[in-house]
């Protein structure tokens, strides 16, 4: 089910712009801000995987309202290199210390994506300007892309975290499991073109 390093490298190259912008470090904020600067519409801004709101607060600087999705209880499955198997056992992996409160500028959806997405779509069925998926699991990333498919347009900027180990050292440390974001995009079936990436796991692209 997982992509090998060679398969992931090849698929990513085939779906990247020739002049893809590469940030030569592992700084998530710098790359995230660049991706946000490429947004040219003012519709929905969404983040899946909020946790401590570090990236969420950055996204808020670019939109009047941002929707955040998370369980805030930790990983729904054990965080391990065999995570794509996704056993039923649960645990408080990476749980947030506090659950944030919603207001006029931030709306939080607490629970598993499969439970909160249907509720969200009943209230908000409009195009998506910016989508940040930082879900840690292939299953979760696939749920997001599938549920929001009709609202992802050519103007939607998509940022996916934990997407691909570009360095052999990272691959040795984490294994092919870090290709889960890339695999979700591949199996999604839409023609995505990546326009930027940082040096570790985070990529950004648009549908063409």
Whereabouts are the PLM-identified features?
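Conserved alpha-helix/loop element of class I SAM-dependent methyltransferases that forms part
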Residues: 27-43
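N-terminal pre-catalytic "stem/leader" segment of glycosyltransferase-like enzymes
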Residues: 1-2
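S-adenosylmethionine/decaboxylated-SAM
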Residues: 5-15, 38-208
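Conserved SAM-binding loop and adjacent beta-strand
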Residues: 17-30
